[in-house]
A protein has these predicted regions:
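RecA-like P-loop NTPase motor core of helicase/translocase proteins
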Residues: 1-322
């Protein structure tokens, strides 16, 4: 059974929010560079059948040529069209210092994964950017994202005349990185945060010089592509250690997609729970609160000042005994 996907305007609006931020950026179908060949072992005797020589030609994302002032002007235009507060400046972060850090807020169940896949295709169509990394907080989400790429491939082929090639990063299948670097098409690497911020030997291979990778470090091959990094559910990846690890990717820009951003950056789109309900995108929303009965002005009260969202949520209160 084939799934049929319908273009939804509210999803297109979320795509356009990111794409229009870079209005004026010229289209460039990748910048050629030489992939680090690593250390090649000398051949002591000619083989009967020579293997095909590996190409060292790579294609990386072109740099953003817009100035900070131009980007901020574009951001303001996007924010005005969506009734969002205007950003005083472009936000930076430890995960992508000096690069655009954009937040897209979308309520759960409104097709967030579809939106960022379509954003990838639209950024490639308009500006030529073709190298992407999607960072997810768990293996389960990683597998779900890969499945989304697989089931939408034909849909995007029909829309754009091409489809993204996606793969899950695996430190034992590093030939995928060679193809990621050299292929001219849309390349998407999906990686869970544990693959590069954990301390185990297998997880740390991304930072090691590997004999089976011509004594190169996988992270160096990745960062040479100047990838666009997309974080799915960033509030689950917010530890300082993880943010510093993300900086190793040398991101051209960082796009965050979530219904509940814990830290705000440059917000370019918002589809919150109430918006989703009003547009009939979700069936219902629930609001949890306190009900107070029989409270007179002369009686004591308890005032809830704030709620801290952490692993164990807690509230800050104020008691007045009058």
């Amino acid at each position: 059974m084939k799934l049929q996907f319908k273009v939804q305007q509210y999803q297109t609006d979320a795509v356009d929010a990111v794409v229009e931020t870079f209005a004026g950026q010229p289209k460039h179908d990748g910048i050629s560079y030489r992939i680090d060949p690593g250390k090649v072992r000398p051949v002591t005797a000619p083989a009967l059948f020579e293997a095909e020589e590996r190409s060292d030609a790579g294609l990386r994302n072109a740099e953003i040529v817009l100035s900070g002032a131009q980007l901020l002007e574009n951001v303001h235009a996007v924010q005005r069209s969506r009734n969002l507060p205007l950003s005083a400046k472009l936000a930076s972060s430890a995960a992508a210092p000096g690069a655009p850090n954009l937040d897209v807020e979308m309520e759960t169940g409104t097709g967030k994964t579809y939106v960022y896949i379509k954003t990838i295709m639209e950024l490639h169509k308009r500006y030529g950017w073709s190298k992407y990394i999607i960072v997810v907080p768990s293996v389960a989400i990683r597998e779900g994202v890969k499945k989304s790429f697989d089931v939408t491939a034909e849909h995007f082929q029909q829309l754009y005349g091409t489809k993204p090639r996606s793969f899950i990063y695996n430190s034992s299948q590093l030939h995928e990185l060679e193809r990621f670097s050299s292929d001219a098409g849309v390349q998407v690497m999906i990686i869970n945060i544990q693959a590069f911020n954990a301390t185990g030997k297998d997880q740390r291979r991304i930072y090691d010089e590997l004999d089976d990778f011509q004594s190169r470090r996988p992270i160096d091959v990745i960062k040479a592509n100047r990838p666009i990094v997309i974080i799915d559910e960033p509030q689950k990846i917010g530890a300082d250690k993880s943010l510093k690890a993300l900086a190793e990717f040398n991101a051209l820009m960082l796009l965050r997609y979530s219904a509940t951003h814990k830290v705000d950056h440059t917000k370019v789109h918002r589809l919150d729970a109430l918006d989703a309900y009003n547009q009939k995108l979700v069936k219902k929303i629930a609001v949890r609160g306190l009900t107070v009965k029989g409270l007179a002005g002369s009686t004591a009260y308890l005032y809830l000042d704030a709620i801290e969202i952490a692993k164990t949520p807690f509230g800050k209160g104020e008691q007045n005994n009058m």
